[in-house]
């Protein structure tokens, strides 16, 4: 028989979401500042109400049951709606508005000043929180911790970062596509040699650790050719790789999106950009569609719609 929500303590649903996120009774307890015993008792009540174990112990922590997995999206949406309801008194005026974004650092830095001006012009008391895009950012959008993400995806058929691989709950719009370039200092010895694949692979490379991986579509293309680059340094951000490639007497090559030219101009880095030495079909596999990402529940949220349109217009003016 269907149970009434009036028989459930709604605080238990917060505990359930934290258990799903943390996969640990102890970690969930720390999040809400209670004892692990209290969380265990809450889990026991939830198991009785749903008539399901919800989680089972595994070597990696709590593993959700099929029922729990099926409820995850609904639970996240319920929590998001609850937060919006509780924040309603603070969001009746612009004073309460908060804009939370996750983006690749140089991608956002080249337009953050212009974006913040437009936000403050419309919402003078708003606050802006910007975080770097990382492996957890899509989950942060799902959890309601990020309004909009702005990140590059990949085009190589074997990539895990294809647009077609995005979670069903995520909506997106491609703002522009970019093909990465090779960035090297203006007096690099490679500039005095024929620019081809052999020259490209002759020198050590800086790699970007992207969503917990040191390799990307470039390495897939090289593997298809039976070749491999020497990765001498791995860094978390494109701007760090450009900074290192620009250092005097440095033989390192950085591969970064063409849009980084705006970043180089801002910081006057002594770098030259060369095309990746591949044919047209290989270049196509390296295309990076830079994409706005948001949760479907926010598709008609006036704040998110306005933010999306503002970012789109800013990048259109740069094209």
UniProtKB/Swiss-Prot annotation:
Domain HTH lysR-type, first and last residues per copy: 8-65
Keyword Transcription: yes
Residue range(s) of DNA binding per entry: 25-44
Pfam families tied to this protein: HTH_1, LysR_substrate
GO molecular-function term, one example from the UniProt record: DNA binding
Alphabetical GO biological process terms: DNA-templated transcription; regulation of DNA-templated transcription
SUPFAM superfamilies reported in the protein's UniProt record: Periplasmic binding protein-like II, Winged helix' DNA-binding domain
Keyword DNA-binding annotated: yes
Gene3D superfamilies membership: Periplasmic binding protein-like II (3.40.190.10), Winged helix-like DNA-binding domain superfamily/Winged helix DNA-binding domain (1.10.10.10)
Annotated keywords: DNA-binding, Transcription, Transcription regulation
Task performed by this protein: Involved in anaerobic NO protection.
Family: Belongs to the LysR transcriptional regulatory family.
Protein's name according to its UniProt entry: HTH-type transcriptional regulator YidZ
């Amino acid at each position: 028989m269907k149970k009434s929500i009036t028989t459930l303590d709604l605080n238990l649903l917060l505990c359930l979401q934290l258990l799903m996120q943390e996969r640990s009774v102890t970690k969930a307890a720390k999040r809400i500042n209670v004892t692990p015993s209290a969380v265990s008792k809450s889990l026991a009540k939830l198991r009785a109400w749903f008539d399901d174990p919800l989680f089972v112990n595994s070597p990696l922590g709590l593993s959700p049951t099929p029922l729990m997995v099926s409820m995850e999206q609904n639970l996240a949406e319920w929590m998001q709606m609850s937060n919006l309801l509780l924040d309603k008194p603070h969001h009746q005026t612009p004073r309460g508005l908060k804009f939370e974004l996750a983006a690749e650092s140089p991608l956002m830095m080249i337009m953050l000043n212009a974006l913040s001006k437009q936000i403050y012009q419309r919402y003078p008391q708003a606050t802006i929180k910007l975080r770097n895009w990382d492996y957890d950012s899509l989950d942060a959008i799902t959890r309601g911790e990020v309004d909009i993400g702005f990140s590059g995806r990949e085009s190589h058929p074997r990539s895990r970062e294809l647009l077609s691989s995005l979670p069903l709950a995520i909506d997106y719009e491609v703002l522009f596509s970019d093909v990465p370039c090779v960035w090297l200092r203006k007096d690099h010895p490679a500039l005095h040699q024929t620019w081809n694949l052999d020259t490209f692979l002759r020198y050590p490379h800086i790699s970007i650790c992207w969503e917990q991986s040191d390799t990307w579509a470039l390495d897939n293309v090289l593997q298809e050719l039976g070749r491999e680059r020497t990765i001498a340094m791995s860094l978390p951000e494109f701007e760090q790789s450009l900074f290192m490639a620009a250092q005097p007497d440095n033989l390192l090559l950085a591969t970064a999106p063409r849009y980084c030219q705006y970043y180089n101009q801002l910081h006057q880095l002594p770098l030259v950009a060369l095309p990746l030495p591949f044919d047209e079909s290989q270049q196509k596999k390296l295309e990076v569609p830079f994409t706005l990402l948001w949760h479907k529940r926010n598709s008609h949220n006036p704040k998110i719609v306005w933010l999306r349109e503002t970012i789109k217009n800013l990048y259109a003016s740069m094209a």
